[in-house]
């Protein structure tokens, strides 16, 4: 599955990103500011835990009845004149969209922000048939013209770039010669993108929530680009993960309120757009043709398992914004378009353990992610479940860990070996110990002891201490 954004060993990626001082500072600043903003809007709303419980109930109910609501959605889209395609795989979704582009002889395609099109790697498929695909979300646009630099955050994809870097990208790619002032940069991007909107043949969007009762899609943005993507081109294609659905407008209102507060610390974003099918007679704008592509791509295999709660996710990135591990290593270290705690849970499920077996270990298990999740996904518990599967079912535990556990099992199963080992341990670790602590551990202990205290084995074994105490010796 084409979800990977970085190759190379996980720990190598981590080491590289730990050297990126700007990125680490930007992430820390984003997390700190976001925490304060989020706290303010949830306190203003009041009864936040009750809202979380309601949102969780909505998502659980929808997933438990997903087949019913997807069928209802499909029927209502068709009633409004739209077309629905259920894609089992990324390849099926890409092929369907590619056929539409060929049929329409599309030369230019404009896109609003969409994680699922990143997930299925749609853009290269369309570019291969000669389409000029333009990302219109400002962050995604910056990354695209910078030689397709991958996103590092679910909500703020260009978080890892500073304004000087963005100015240099604009200079190289767009002939921009003004300052690095964000207002000037945004104005230049807006003027450039305006021409693309007006000449686009197809508009492609993601979907925050599809509404089953009406066949509508909901788009939540702060830039307004999605409105132009859906209003000006003659053909609109919306791509959604199969779980991004709600039964009615009532549930949509609850989840949008949770999404905006959790994602960007706002009561509402600047634009919340609800679209229903193609343009009807008398409408001033809108597409003449509407296609809804509903993507499975591994999601159905998660339903009914212990990992089903991860499909409750509304892509707010609240978990990312409080994660201490993400704070230090950034998004690119994860090697997946889905980073942070949600990425560490979701990526192995969609992409497999071969590529993402390290991600469940990229966590302190502090449970901050679980505490802030607006739909109550038990993220830290799911990370532990992944670790269990990696060791017990997949057999993908590190070699050093396997050997250590085997030695421990042999030693503790044999009384004579255990006695010998406890006698030998103090002298064996003495070269690595200082003041009762192992400060320069050998082998697998090296990384641990560089940042954590590891007590050295005591010279007196417990059984000897206990025997002396029974005889009336010094208990200390």
UniProtKB/Swiss-Prot annotation:
GO terms for biological process: lactate metabolic process. Gene3D superfamilies: Alpha-helical ferredoxin, NagB/RpiA/CoA transferase-like. PROSITE patterns: 4FE4S_FER_1 (PS00198), 4FE4S_FER_2 (PS51379). InterPro entries: 4Fe4S_Fe-S-bd (IPR017896), 4Fe4S_Fe_S_CS (IPR017900), FTHF_cligase-like_sf (IPR024185), Helical_ferredxn (IPR009051), LUD_dom (IPR003741), LutB (IPR022825), LutB/LldF (IPR004452), LutB_C (IPR024569). It comes from the Bacteria. The keyword Electron transport applies. GO terms for molecular function: 4 iron, 4 sulfur cluster binding; metal ion binding. [4Fe-4S] cluster 1 binds at residues 313, 316, 319, 373. This is Lactate utilization protein B. Residues 304-334, 353-382 form the 4Fe-4S ferredoxin-type domain. [4Fe-4S] cluster 2 binds at residues 323, 366, 369. It comes from Geobacillus thermodenitrificans (strain NG80-2).
């Amino acid at each position: 599955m084409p979800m990977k954004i970085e190759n190379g060993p996980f720990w190598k990626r981590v080491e590289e990103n730990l050297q990126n001082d700007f990125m680490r500072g930007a992430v820390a600043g984003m997390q700190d500011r976001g925490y304060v903003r989020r706290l303010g809007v949830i306190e203003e709303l009041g009864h936040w835990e009750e809202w979380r419980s309601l949102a969780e109930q909505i998502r659980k109910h929808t997933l438990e009845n997903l087949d019913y609501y997807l069928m209802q959605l499909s029927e209502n889209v068709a009633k409004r004149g739209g077309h629905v395609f259920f894609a089992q795989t990324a390849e099926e979704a890409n092929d369907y969209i590619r056929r539409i582009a060929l049929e329409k002889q599309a030369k230019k395609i404009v896109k609003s922000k969409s994680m699922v099109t990143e997930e299925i790697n749609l853009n290269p498929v369309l570019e291969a048939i000669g389409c000029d695909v333009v990302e219109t979300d400002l962050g995604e646009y910056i990354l695209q013209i910078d030689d397709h630099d991958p996103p590092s955050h679910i909500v703020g994809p260009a978080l890892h770039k500073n304004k000087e870097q963005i100015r240099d990208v604009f200079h190289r790619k767009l002939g921009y010669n003004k300052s690095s002032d964000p207002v000037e940069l945004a104005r230049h991007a807006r003027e450039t993108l305006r021409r693309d909107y007006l000449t686009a043949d197809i508009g492609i969007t993601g979907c925050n929530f599809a509404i089953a009762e009406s066949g509508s899609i909901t788009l939540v943005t702060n830039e307004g680009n999605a409105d132009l993507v859906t209003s000006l081109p003659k053909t609109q294609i919306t791509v959604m993960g199969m779980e991004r659905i709600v039964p009615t407008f009532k549930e949509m209102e609850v989840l949008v309120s949770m999404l905006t507060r959790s994602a960007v610390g706002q009561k509402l974003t600047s634009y919340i757009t609800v679209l229903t099918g193609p343009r009807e007679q008398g409408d001033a704008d809108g597409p003449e043709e509407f296609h809804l592509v509903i993507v499975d791509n591994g999601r159905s295999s998660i339903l009914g398992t212990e990992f089903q709660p991860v499909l409750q996710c509304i892509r707010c990135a609240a978990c990312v914004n409080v994660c201490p591990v993400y704070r230090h290593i950034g998004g690119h270290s994860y090697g997946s378009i889905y980073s942070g705690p949600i990425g560490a849970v979701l990526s192995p499920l969609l992409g497999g353990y071969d590529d993402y077996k390290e991600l469940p270990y990229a966590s302190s298990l502090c449970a901050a992610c679980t505490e802030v999740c607006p739909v109550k996904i038990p993220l830290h518990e799911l990370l532990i479940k992944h670790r269990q599967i990696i060791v017990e079912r997949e057999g993908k535990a590190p070699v050093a860990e396997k050997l250590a556990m085997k030695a421990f099992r042999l030693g503790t199963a044999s009384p004579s070996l255990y006695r010998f080992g406890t006698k030998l341990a103090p002298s064996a670790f003495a070269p690595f110990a200082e003041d009762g602590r192992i400060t320069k551990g050998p082998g697998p202990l090296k990384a641990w002891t560089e940042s954590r205290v590891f007590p050295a084995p005591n010279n007196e074994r417990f059984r000897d201490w206990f025997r002396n105490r029974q005889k009336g010796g010094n208990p200390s």
